[in-house]
Amino acid sequence: MSDKQTTENAVDYKATLNLPDTQFAMKANLAVREVKWLEEWYTDNIYQQIRASRIGKKKYILHDGPPYANGTIHLGHAVNKVLKDIIVKSRTLAGFDAPYVPGWDCHGLPIELKVEEKVGKVGEKVDAATFRKHCREYALKQIDLQRTDFKRLGILGDWDNPYLTMNYKQEADIFRALGLIQKNDHIQPGLKPVNWCMDCGSALAEAEVEYEDKKSDAIDVGFGVVDLKDLSARVNVDVQDPTDIVIWTTTPWTLPANQAVALHAEIEYQLVQVTTERGKQNFILAKDLVASAIERYKLENPVVLADFTGSALENLTLQHPLLTDRQVPVILGEHVIATSGTGAVHTAPGHGADDYKVGLQYNLKVENPVGGNGVYLPTAPIFAGEHIYKANPKIIEALGAVGRLWAHQPIKHSYPHCWRHKTPIIFRATPQWFISMDQKGLRDGALNAIENDIEFVPNWGKNRIESMIEGRPDWCISRQRTWGVPIPFFVHKDTNELHPRTPELIEEVAKLIEQEGIDAWFNRDAKDFIGEDAEQYNAVRDTLDVWFDSGTTHYAVLEQREELESPADLYLEGSDQHRGWFQSSLLTSMAIHNRAPYKALLTHGFTVDENGRKLSKSLGNYIPLEEIIKQLGADGLRLYVASSDYRYEIAASKEIFSRVSDSYRRIRNTLRFLLANLNGFKPSTDALAVDDLIALDQYILQRANEVQQTIITAYEEMNFHVVCSALTSFCINDLGGFYLDIIKDRQYTTKADSQARRSAQTALYHIVQAFVRWMSPILSFTAQEAWPLIPEQTDKYVFTAEWYDLPVSSKANLLSEADWQTLISVKSAVNKQIESARNAKLVGSNLSAKVELWANESLQTVLNQLADELRFVLITSQVVVHPFAEQGEATEMEGLRVQVSAAEGEKCARCWHVLPDVNTHADHPGLCGRCIVNVTGRGEVRKYA
């Protein structure tokens, strides 16, 4: 029959094909549709439905570290919350009852500063109670804004009942936590040097301190030896000339508080003599630093008079360079080094942690002549009423005037700054309340828990928090602020002892706070609580460090809420929290219960640009979160987070987001194909037993099961980038690059209810059930969009489901997995040859090709098993297998050569295969024999593909 006759007699066979059909849209339009879905979810109380589905199941508790209730959320917040949501959803899939209770940190300075901008400072334009009321209102507004943004990301949680550190009940329980720590004797008052911000007017926690470069005046100052005979006896040389032990410091303003000069017991020192304008002068300097110091003093030719170690000079008396009525001792300290400066350290216990620590050993006076605003107090020995930074040049000038300034150089160095004001802080001794690290073994207990009880992801987190706790000072928990949880202590005016009824008083105050909030403490007098004892006791008016608020949520939240429990399975935050929330939580839990509050810590990196720079508006690389969601939708953002290896810094750029968008489309298109080809399939009546499936369908279920095991393990180990990799690889290689292309012919052209089609649909049904679950913790919106489109789906939400039990054939398959891998390799080799033939204009599509294979014996064994069905695997119209010979073109497979030519015959109007028997049946013009059987007969039978 001629081509003209074929065209004239053509019949439209489209109606005889099983074409795919689904309501699952090709275009996601996530940025618009996600908002609608969210509204439906929360109207339907989705979170409560998830909880109801897990009643009686073993709990998994991820405890939410509270973000601060101030400002809009950014990409870093999104990374944190999405990671938490992925974990909660994957643990729910694993059958756990995994509640998620979000929280907010509500007290503290940042909110005070915002409120001050609106209503003024306390005591100037507004009273404290009114100020606290405004702080509470401001925090609530910020929480509402952040809650909306977090929900938009698809984070499922108890958003209507979050924990807030300013809730009356939680404020009361923070009180109670403090009481338990005090009862266990971990709290002590003290006049100790603390990080102090002059702008905040308050002490700062370690976590509130950042290091930035600062320009300072570095000076070398001489402390004169008072008794040269004493010195002579110590160093075994007759000393006649003026002798200075020289200190080097970058904080001249601390010199009025100096109480000693520290040397190291084992460092070698030298007594050297030089000639100055005033005559002969002796210096005591660390041996390794003599040359650099003498050069700094612009002097020459030092003569060494004696060598000795620092221990020889212990308790030698020195003259303070500025205060004629003060003499100070030489002391020994382990903190002294000989790598810079002079090897001698100016020691002011009121202005430094090391100074304070070594001062305790020598019973040195803790003197603090500086007020909270950085101004010398009226009682200061010199420069009273001057700001310390204005006094600095005057101190330097005074030292020069008395001949004690040996060098003055400006330097740039790393110096602690206030995290809020970005201004340099000072170390200042003030009466504060501390959690002692060593009084009751808190440090050792915490280190033991780190070593034995806590899992770290990644494992370097262990060394980081361990080193921080090993070296940290006592925790100053008191603050001089208005908006914070008070410290409900009564201190005896004479003895400084706490009231003997402190535990009972804390509970009494806590009960009042449950009803009235923290104003219940601030608005009452001491005698309202302790009656006539008020004449002998002062009520503490300090507030708690906000890190204590959040650090005690293991007690105030996990132990108080029925759906939660302590210790938590996991705390998850950014890497900065090793010195913040992770540490404050560990210390308070050890102080209360002598156990860690978490079983595992997960740390994620920060978001940076493609060059590793921090995202910031000032650098011009900041990407607003709403812009990302507009481009990718929340699901695209979630895929970006999950695809990143959070153990390192997480790069963000438009190019990266574009790649994520491509990955999302690939997954979505695969999912759409799966759903579309389940058209007309009812699992209850149409599904086949897995042992009755065609070999290819059994193989793909086996592969799906292997992928599922990889994915489940990756979720359990919190390797979400591995989940994404396995998911996309399955889409690209197993499904898109192999299985789905092969089954199209069977799906579309065999009889609708044939074993051949139902076998493929059965496999597709099982795969889509598993596939949607795999993606649901990450691509939550898309998974739920697809979920109700799975035939005969019973559960309303994928989020109440558990991992799918993928069926795998128990009997020996016709082809082994190794055989299928061989076929995949052959298919790849054939495709390359067809592509070459297409480029040479020998063939058009794959179905217009005839493929001849020359295969060695082992390959033939596999290929010949499939007989005529081999063409369906290779997606060609005709395949011929020959014994191996040097024919055709060589391939990358050993023992395989291929030749591609145009297939013989005509193109079937229905299946598009080119076959000799097309148009050989007058009643069915344009059809091949196989299609005639599928249209009018019992349908073809498949065994392999």
Residues of each region from the PLM?
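Conserved phosphate-binding loops in nucleotide/dinucleotide-binding enzymes
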Residues: 122, 212, 347-350, 389, ...
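Catalytic adenosine-cofactor/nucleotide-binding cores of aminoacyl-tRNA synthetases and other
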Residues: 417-421, 606-693, 791-794, 840-843
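Acidic, turn-prone loop/beta-hairpin segments
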Residues: 105, 194, 198, 204-212, ...
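NTP-handling and nucleic-acid-processing catalytic cores
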Residues: 29-39, 156, 168-373, 447-478, ...
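Alpha-helical recognition segments enriched in aromatics with Gly/Pro capping
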Residues: 227, 362-374, 481-483, 491, ...
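Short cysteine-rich clusters marking metal-coordination/redox-active sites
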Residues: 197, 418, 492, 528-531, ...
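Core structural elements
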Residues: 150, 173, 475, 662-675, ...
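N-terminal, positively charged nucleic-acid-binding surface of large information/translation enzymes
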Residues: 2-280, 348-361, 365-383, 404-443, ...
